[in-house]
Amino acid sequence: MEFSTTLALFFTLSIFLVGAQAKVPVDDQFRVVNEGGYTDYSPIEYNPDVRGFVPFSDNFRLCFYNTTQNAYTLALRIGNRAQESTLRWVWEANRGSPVKENATLTFGEDGNLVLAEADGRVVWQTNTANKGVVGIKILENGNMVIYDSNGKFVWQSFDSPTDTLLVGQSLKLNGQNKLVSRLSPSVNANGPYSLVMEAKKLVLYYTTNKTPKPIGYYEYEFFTKIAQLQSMTFQAVEDADTTWGLHMEGVDSGSQFNVSTFLSRPKHNATLSFLRLESDGNIRVWSYSTLATSTAWDVTYTAFTNDNTDGNDECRIPEHCLGFGLCKKGQCNACPSDIGLLGWDETCKIPSLASCDPKTFHYFKIEGADSFMTKYNGGSTTTESACGDKCTRDCKCLGFFYNRKSSRCWLGYELKTLTKTGDTSLVAYVKAPNASKKSALAI
């Protein structure tokens, strides 16, 4: 027994010593200070200031960038400055936690990649210290990896997507299972939209501080019976000798076969493509050609279009009309109010209530109007008047939607974009203060 214990201790100590002896060679270590002039002046997504540095590959480069003064994000961009095409961002380390001038990015002999403020406060790190790391590099597919002496990845950027999936990158059940949109082109914080891998499908959600739970506004479903999705990967699949298709491919725990949904067939090299949940709530696939110049980028897939092929036009995106608006075929063309349909502009908003007391407000009705929430959320079965009573008793409810054919009711904690349908069995009710005029709007 004593011999076994001693032997086990010996092997444990040996493994520890081997790991401890593995260090990053001096020539592969670096310390970058966020200072000095800017490096990239080609057209750049979000119109930021950029400082690029090593490591980089032919098509990818690690950079500091900012869209507001003295607030920098550590990010990976794709594109080639020589082509004069737009450089785009495909991965970020510190969204929502920007660093200032003179911040540092350090890759030392212990193998940890650390982003810190000038005063030493750590903002982000890979937590790879003393794990046998010997190097860092960016692969041809845009995956930034930290690896050991056997070439095994100790850390990889593919495991922590933000709003983007590169070809070969996945959402995982036991890992990062969602993408989260950017708040806006100028503000790099988490936005209200997310693409989530659930047990049997991919779902687009809209979430704000007013919604009791995320509201689904689009779903990717699969015709194959699924037990539990383990992962969903953005893949480039060779269809023929000269054509490639872009798919989302899922691995199901209950089947030996993958499930797949086809997205697009780029005319360029499909392997330099990425799928992104945009700040506007749409999903787009961008494909890049290393041969083209200013036309290097193609949008090869868009989830919400205005071609009327599947009913999922841009009016189905919650904030397409910003604060409030009535939409048809992707166009925000009216601002509903209880004095009529007014012309829409960016100032359109829902009525403001001074009190939750039912005596102080009423509803105005919009016939033929639908909501982004009704298609993928079941609602409840009740009468039209009972639906209104529920909203009236709920101070957070801004209005409600009712389907007279199915007797389904949805309470609206965010109204945002309404869709004009022409179907009078669909009706929307909006709370308005009693100081304004009551009106029923037929559209």
Swiss-Prot record:
Glycosylation site list: 66, 102, 258, 269, 434
Record-annotated disulphide pairs: 387-409, 391-397
Superkingdom of the source species: Eukaryota
Signal peptide per UniProt: 1-22
Subcellular location: Secreted; Secreted, Cell wall
Domain (PAN): residue spans on this chain: 356-433
A GO-annotated cellular component: mitochondrion
Name recorded for this polypeptide: EP1-like glycoprotein 4
Organism of provenance: Arabidopsis thaliana (Mouse-ear cress)
Molecular-function annotations in GO: carbohydrate binding
